[in-house]
């Protein structure tokens, strides 16, 4: 006998507005509030973006002909325009993001490779210089020690 109320087995976290489990209610972008004081909500996901401005004008002219100038029809037309604008904005943002992110990643990778190559070259140069300096110091020590040895030998023979 399962209880009809919510329990841990049948609760699924998701959006209460559109029912999609991929996001929570406060993250929902499928519905827009037209007026925060009223409880009017727009469903963005149901609008089609393929309608042109001409089709909108035809629909408005038909409404004028039939004489349906109630507040509801005006609000509906406003809502549709608002939906289309918001959808166009979101589509434009998505295109920019996808375009720029891939290019930036490629640029970053090439920059990193260049930095690594330059760092390797610098490291090799520094090693060579250190080896040269070390060899010079050893030669000086050898020459100093040999000259001191020869001077001591010459003093012994005199």
Curated annotation (Swiss-Prot):
Basic and acidic residues composition bias: residue spans: 59-79
GO biological process, alphabetically ordered: mRNA processing; RNA splicing
In the record, what terms sit under GO molecular function?
Answer: nucleic acid binding; zinc ion binding
From which residue to which do the CCHC-type zinc fingers run?
13-30
Among Pfam families, the record links this protein to: zf-CCHC_3 (PF13917)
Q: Which UniProt keywords apply?
A: Metal-binding, mRNA processing, mRNA splicing, Zinc, Zinc-finger
Bias (Low complexity) ranges: 145-158
Stretches for region Disordered: 1-20, 45-158
InterPro entries listed in its UniProt record: Znf_CCHC (IPR001878)
Q: Where is the composition biased (Basic residues)?
A: 80-98, 111-140
Known function:
Possible splicing regulator involved in the control of cellular survival.
Question: What is the protein named?
Answer: Protein SREK1IP1
Which species is the source of this protein?
Danio rerio (Zebrafish)
């Amino acid at each position: 006998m399962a209880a009809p109320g919510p329990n841990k087995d049948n609760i699924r976290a998701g959006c209460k507005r559109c029912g999609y489990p991929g996001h929570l209610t406060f993250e929902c972008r499928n519905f827009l509030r037209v007026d925060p004081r009223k409880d009017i909500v727009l469903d963005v996901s149901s609008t089609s973006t393929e309608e042109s401005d001409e089709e909108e004008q035809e629909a408005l002219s038909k409404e004028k002909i039939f004489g349906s100038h109630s507040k509801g029809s005006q609000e509906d037309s406003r809502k549709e325009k608002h939906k289309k604008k918001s959808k166009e904005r979101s589509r434009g943002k998505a295109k920019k993001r996808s375009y720029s992110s891939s290019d930036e990643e490629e640029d970053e990778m090439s920059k990193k490779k260049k930095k690594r190559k330059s760092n390797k070259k610098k490291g090799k140069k520094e090693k060579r210089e250190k080896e040269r300096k070390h060899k010079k110091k050893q030669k000086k020590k050898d020459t100093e020690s040999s000259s001191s040895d020869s001077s001591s030998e010459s003093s012994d023979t005199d």
